């Protein structure tokens, strides 16, 4: 293919326009402008993606991978460790390391985790963060969403328990703002989702433009139809447009 080539290595193919395989063994690079940098049996079909390691697959564009046996199908993603996956609808996500982990949302970072599929007595543990956003222009509460706007509930799978820290910051059109922190624990027992105890809500600081006393903006977490919703409540007495952003940090055990 035009502009493609291999430099060193063994039995590798560079088939995409401007693609390359450099000192790589048995790799196949068919994505345009993609490159395999050393490694073994790397398969790259995503445009402008790159990777190292062995037996990794990258179908997402503008992505990078390392480690072994990983699959990166989300665009603008990053995947490392061993046998980890970034899903196709999870753009802008990353797995920093660990074993047998899979992303759940777009804009998610799995910092580390470990899933032992051979011994059911070994706990699955993971530490992850998902980034959040919302825009409000009225006085009604609204559900915050993932950064790509596609998901508005954050529920552990059956058999899992999450210890959660939620940070949300709001900024009004007049550049006034506020910030909140919420800590809570949620479990899923055979489809029945429960928040254990009461979420701890701390208003870290809040400008009066976001309301005062009973009219002040706030954040709530609750279970509706066995799904966890995070609601941002704008100022109640008058509509003030606001941008809301934050992240949900999860420590997960199953």
Q: Where are these predicted regions, by residue range?
A:
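Intrinsic disorder/low-complexity signal
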Residues: 1, 25-27, 164, 182, ...
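Periodic small-residue-enriched repeat registers in elongated scaffold domains
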Residues: 1-145, 149-154, 246-250
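Surface-exposed ligand/attachment interfaces on beta-rich extracellular proteins
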Residues: 117-162, 169-178, 190-241, 254
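Short beta-strand elements
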Residues: 181-188
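Short, low-complexity, polar/charged sequence segments that are solvent-exposed and flexible
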Residues: 186, 250-254
């Amino acid at each position: 293919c035009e502009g493609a080539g291999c430099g060193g290595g063994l039995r590798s193919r560079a088939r995409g326009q401007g693609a390359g395989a450099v000192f790589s063994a048995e790799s196949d690079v068919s994505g345009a402008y993609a490159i395999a940098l050393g490694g073994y049996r790397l398969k790259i079909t995503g445009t402008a993606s790159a990777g190292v390691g062995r037996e990794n697959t990258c179908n997402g564009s503008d992505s990078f991978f390392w480690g072994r046996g990983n699959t990166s199908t989300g665009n603008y993603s990053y995947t490392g460790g061993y046998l980890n996956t970034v899903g196709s609808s999870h753009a802008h996500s990353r797995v920093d390391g660990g074993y047998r982990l899979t992303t759940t949302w777009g804009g998610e970072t799995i910092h580390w985790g470990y899933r032992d599929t051979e011994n059911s007595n070994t706990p699955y543990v993971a530490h992850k963060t998902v980034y959040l956003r919302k825009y409000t222009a009225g006085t009604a509460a609204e559900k915050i969403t993932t950064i790509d706007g596609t998901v508005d509930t954050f529920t552990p799978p059956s058999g899992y328990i999450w210890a959660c820290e939620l940070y949300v910051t709001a900024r009004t059109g007049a550049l006034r703002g506020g910030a909140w922190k919420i800590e809570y624990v949620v479990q899923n027992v055979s489809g029945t989702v429960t928040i254990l105890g009461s979420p701890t809500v701390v208003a870290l600081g809040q400008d009066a433009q976001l309301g005062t006393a009973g009219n002040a903006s706030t954040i709530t977490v609750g279970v509706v139809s066995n799904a966890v919703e995070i609601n941002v409540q704008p100022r109640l007495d008058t509509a003030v447009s606001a941008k809301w952003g934050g992240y949900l940090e999860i420590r997960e055990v199953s």
